[in-house]
């Protein structure tokens, strides 16, 4: 069973007036067309809050995140019931790259930064299918969002663990 905990919860009156940024409504996830792994899962993430998914191994935390990110198909999984709504728009069934463009990014543990490449090269690697003009603005946004990544041309292997995680998040976004 997945437990959610809200941090920085807004006052009840404010929370009711604001539609949730992310809403997972009664989803069911099935792998290989027969293995039911989630049933009736619902959660809401109000704008400006942090929600933690807590649970034992095998409780469905990663599956929930993969469902939200659109990554279930890579493991023969699918959301067979319910809906996932982000910023007022239903996103289940949408390709993962389009979900990223809408602002949902999943970066798992294990940063997989290429240490012999620069920060800039690592970011460009995440956007290898896109044109330079389109990628440039996204890369600038990453460096603005993470000011600790001020050195674009330094080797990523010399970054701290936290900076490498920032770089991994930026690469997923670019």
Question: Where does each model-flagged region fall?
Answer:
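ABC-type ATPase nucleotide-binding domains, specifically the catalytic core motifs of the NBD
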Residues: 32-33, 51, 72-75, 119-137, ...
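Short beta-strand immediately N-terminal to the Walker A/P-loop
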Residues: 51-52, 106
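The feature captures the beta-strand-to-loop junction immediately N-terminal to the Walker
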Residues: 54-56
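Helix-to-loop junction immediately C-terminal to a conserved catalytic motif
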Residues: 69
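Conserved ABC transporter NBD signature motif
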Residues: 79-89, 102, 135-137
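Conserved ABC nucleotide-binding domain
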Residues: 91-94, 142-158, 174
């Amino acid at each position: 069973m997945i437990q959610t905990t809200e941090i920085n919860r807004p006052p009840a009156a404010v929370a009711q007036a604001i539609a949730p940024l992310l809403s997972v409504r009664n989803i069911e996830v099935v792998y290989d067309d027969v293995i039911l792994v989630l049933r009736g899962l619902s959660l809401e993430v109000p704008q400006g809050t942090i929600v933690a998914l807590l649970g034992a191994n095998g409780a469905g935390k990663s599956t929930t995140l993969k469902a939200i990110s659109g990554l279930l198909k890579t493991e023969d999984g699918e959301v067979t019931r319910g809906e996932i709504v982000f910023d007022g728009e239903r996103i289940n069934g949408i390709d993962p790259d389009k979900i990223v463009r809408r602002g949902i990014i999943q970066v798992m543990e294990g940063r997989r930064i290429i240490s012999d490449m620069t920060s800039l090269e690592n970011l460009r690697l995440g956007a290898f299918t896109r044109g330079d003009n389109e990628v440039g603005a996204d890369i600038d946004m990453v460096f603005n969002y993470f000011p600790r990544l001020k050195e674009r041309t330094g080797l990523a292997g010399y970054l701290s663990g936290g900076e490498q995680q920032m770089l991994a998040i930026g690469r997923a976004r670019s």
